[in-house]
C-alpha cells in the first residue's frame, strides 16, 4: 500500500510545480529547487499541505527540500500532533 503522506506531498508538488513524478530524476531525493521550487511556490505548497506557517514545521521542511525529507518531517509531525 502506498504511503498516504507521500502521496499527498507528491500530488501537491506535481500540481504546484507543474511536473510529473518522472521528473524526479533522483527519485524522492530530488532537490525540489531543481524543479522550480521558489519561495512563492513553497508558501503555496505549505497551504496545500495544511502546514501552519506560524509553526516551526516550515523551517524544518526548508532544511530538506525533497519529497523524501518532507515525508519524514510531515510523518513525524503527524505523530507529534494530538488527535
From Swiss-Prot:
Q: Which cofactor does it need?
A: pantetheine 4'-phosphate
Recorded hits in PROSITE patterns, A to Z, give:
CARRIER
Name of the protein in question: Acyl carrier protein MmaB
Keyword entries, A-Z: Fatty acid metabolism, Lipid metabolism, Phosphopantetheine, Phosphoprotein
Highest taxon, organism lineage = Bacteria
Instruction: Spell out the InterPro entries in the cross-references.
Output: ACP-like_sf (IPR036736), PP-bd_ACP (IPR009081)
Q: One Pfam family from the UniProt entry?
A: PP-binding
Modified positions (O-(pantetheine 4'-phosphoryl)serine) in chain numbering? 39
Tell me the organism.
Mycobacterium marinum (strain ATCC BAA-535 / M)
Sorted alphabetically, the Gene Ontology BP terms of this entry are:
fatty acid metabolic process
